Every structure is written in C-alpha cells, then in structure tokens.
C-alpha cells in the first residue's frame, strides 16, 4: 500500500487567540493532486502556509499538532526551513515574478544554492519552462523582463521557478483565480501534466476545477475539515449535508 508523503495530524493554527484551523488531520499521497475547497476564511490557505512554515515570521501565529513530511517533523528545531521550502514549493494566488528576466526568475533559487555553471543553469531553465508548459512561448524572450508577460504567462513562469528547485510537493494557493478562463485552462493542463512527477495541494474556489483535475478533495468550513476523500465520490455522493450544499452552490 502506498505510504503518504505528507501527514497532518490534529493540526490547529491560531492567529492571536483566534483559531483559524481546528484539529485537522489529513494524509497526502505521492503523485496526486488534492483540492482544498470551502468558503473564504475556512482555513484552506492557512493549512498550506502551515505545511511549509510560512507563518514562522509572524509572531501572532501559533500552532499545535504535527506536520510530517516523509516521516520527519516539519516543526522540529532541526528542520532547515530553507531546505524545507525547496522540497515543498509554493505558488501564490497573484503571479509574483521578480523584476528581472525570465531566465533569472527561473534560476533564482539555484543561484541562492551557489550554482553558477552556465550549462547547468541553461538546462534547468529549459527543463523547468517546458515542465510549466511555457517554453515555446518564451524561449526567444528569456532575457526580457518577466513583468512584460501576460498574467497567465507570469504564473507559469512562477511555476517554472518552483520546479527549478526540484521540489517533491507543490502547494498552489488559488493559482488561477486572478486569470482569464483561457489562461486558467493552460495552468490546469500544466498541473495535470506535472502529476507524474510531483504531489500537489491546490486551493481553489472553482468546483469545476476541483472536479476536473484533483484525485482527492478536502472540504473546509469555519476552520474544520468537514469531509475528505476521493474527488469523484465526494462530488457524486457527498457524505455530509454541508458538503453537498457547498458543491451545489447553496452557499459559498
């Protein structure tokens, strides 16, 4: 039986004294896309940020419970957060390319690791941009500013930047919500093509998107994980009334 690559156990997250995530437990499996759905403020993005310790610099954030990655406690004092975020990369809601060339955006993390060899960097750029399904669109513009690209292209460059550090897990926080439908569709195709190599957690507002590309879905409400399971089963036969009401649009 396949072992989970990531396990969240009884995880609670607090902002000051407000409990944003309440005793959540989930297992995530290799080479699957897991969609996280639910109304705004239900805890989906909080979970992503807890997984790769994005809350470390915010003194108002505290948490209890455990996050285990490949059997290691993410919150152990021995965990190197820089290395952790290379293993567990993140793509945000708004495309956030750096104000530099497409090439330098993609190799940014590699340069931080001290990699200077031109052939290595060139190969990483081509491989990562192909993985993000944007190589053909930018191969003649590698040294132009990434800020000159369309929003959808910028987001795929951000995905390529994440791929360049060779993560095992990619966290995606509503990566298509700021994009037009055509650009969003290209991102979905990209994610589907990456599934053989990566494990992905996707926060999405779109029920159609969740049903199209995810293997499992977790439904959150008011910081609670209401239901978690196979996507097709959940959408066809939800076990909880709250889940059914949400995915059928009775509230959102």
From Swiss-Prot:
GO terms for molecular function: ATP binding; ATP hydrolysis activity; ATPase-coupled phosphate ion transmembrane transporter activity. ATP binds at residues 38-45. InterPro entries: AAA+_ATPase, ABC_transporter-like_ATP-bd, ABC_transporter-like_CS, P-loop_NTPase, PstB-like. It is a peripheral membrane protein. Keywords: ATP-binding, Cell membrane, Membrane, Nucleotide-binding, Phosphate transport, Translocase, Transport. One of its GO terms (biological process) is phosphate ion transmembrane transport. It catalyses: phosphate(out) + ATP + H2O = ADP + 2 phosphate(in) + H(+). It is found in: Cell membrane. Its main location: membrane. SMART domains: AAA (SM00382). SUPFAM superfamilies: P-loop containing nucleoside triphosphate hydrolases. It is an enzyme of class 7 (translocase). Its EC number is 7.3.2.1. One of its GO terms (cellular component) is plasma membrane. Residues 6-247 form the ABC transporter domain. CDD domains: ABC_PstB_phosphate_transporter. The keyword Metal-binding does not apply. Belongs to the ABC transporter superfamily. Phosphate importer (TC 3.A.1.7) family. NCBIfam families: 3a0107s01c2. PANTHER family: ABC TRANSPORTER I FAMILY MEMBER 17. The complex is composed of two ATP-binding proteins (PstB), two transmembrane proteins (PstC and PstA) and a solute-binding protein (PstS). Part of the ABC transporter complex PstSACB involved in phosphate import. Responsible for energy coupling to the transport system. This is Phosphate import ATP-binding protein PstB 1.
């Amino acid at each position: 039986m396949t072992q989970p690559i990531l396990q969240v156990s009884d995880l609670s997250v607090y902002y000051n004294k407000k409990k944003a995530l309440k005793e959540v437990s989930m297992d995530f499996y290799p080479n699957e896309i897991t969609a996280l759905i639910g109304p705004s403020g239900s805890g989906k993005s909080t979970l992503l940020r807890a997984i790769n310790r994005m809350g470390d610099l915010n003194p108002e954030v505290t948490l209890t419970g455990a996050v285990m990655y490949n059997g290691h406690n993410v919150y152990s004092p021995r965990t190197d957060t820089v290395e952790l975020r290379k293993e567990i990369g993140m793509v945000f809601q708004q495309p956030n390319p750096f104000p530099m060339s497409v090439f330098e955006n993609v190799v940014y993390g590699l340069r931080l690791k001290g990699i200077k060899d031109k052939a290595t960097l060139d190969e990483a750029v081509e491989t990562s941009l192909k993985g993000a399904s944007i190589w053909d669109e930018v191969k003649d513009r590698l040294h132009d500013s990434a800020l000159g690209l369309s929003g959808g292209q910028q987001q795929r460059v951000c995905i390529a930047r994440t791929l360049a550090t060779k993560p095992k897990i990619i966290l995606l926080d509503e990566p298509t919500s700021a994009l037009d439908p055509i650009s969003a569709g290209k991102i979905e195709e990209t994610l589907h093509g990456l599934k053989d190599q990566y494990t992905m957690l996707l926060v999405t507002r779109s029920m159609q998107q969740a049903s199209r590309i995810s293997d499992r879905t977790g439904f959150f409400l008011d910081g609670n994980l209401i239901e978690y399971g196979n996507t097709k089963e959940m959408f066809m036969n939800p076990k909880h009334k709250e889940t059914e009401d949400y995915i059928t649009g009775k509230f959102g």
